[in-house]
Amino acid sequence: MLCAAFAAWIYLGFVLPFRAAAAGRDMLAVRIQGYEASDVLDMLQFLRAHPDAAAIQHGIYAGPALVFPVALAALLFLLMKRARPGGVFFGRAIPAAVIAALFFLPILYGLADCGETLLGALLFPPATPSDQATTMAANILPILVRLKFVVLVVTLILLIRFAALSHRSEQD
């Protein structure tokens, strides 16, 4: 429920006002399809010329975008624990090391999402990074967003799989 409240706060309090201030543009962080380095540089130029949109984006980076990934990572971790990963894969028991790695996935999601937020806060106005830092951030941000969404999708698929398997074994 807390994650849903954060998502609603982000959408209603920041995404919609940003779209209004940016003539229909979306923040990079909410583009599910991802983005490229050129999109980052384009957004940087846009925000430098539009201080209202820059202030809204800075507000999300300074508040809910730092808390939401941590809350969602904790929720995913707890759901993974409740789903009790385990069982067999191709007739062999899943090794303990693999199960431990599965529990690391929600943590990796949280790190990637927080990394994207922190790097965005250091790149976009009111920050004034050097040209070298801008180039580096523009190249790293697309990698972080792809990592974030891939890990999130894999975690959700695994949660569904383990929940279905544990539910089926309880019925047997």
Predicted regions and their residues:
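Interfacial segments of alpha-helical transmembrane regions
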Residues: M1-C3, G91-L108
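Hydrophobic core of alpha-helical transmembrane segments in multi-pass integral membrane proteins
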Residues: M1-G13, A73-L76, V153-I160
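Interfacial loop at the N-terminal end of multi-pass membrane proteins
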Residues: M1-I60, T128
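Juxtamembrane loop-transmembrane helix junctions in multi-pass integral membrane proteins
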Residues: A49-D52, I56-G59, G87-A100, P129-I143
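Hydrophobic alpha-helical transmembrane segments
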Residues: G59-K81
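Alpha-helical transmembrane segments of integral membrane proteins
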Residues: P64-A71, I99, F103, V145-L152
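Alpha-helical transmembrane segments of multi-pass integral membrane proteins
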Residues: L105-I160
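Short, charged juxtamembrane terminal tails flanking transmembrane helices
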Residues: A164-D172
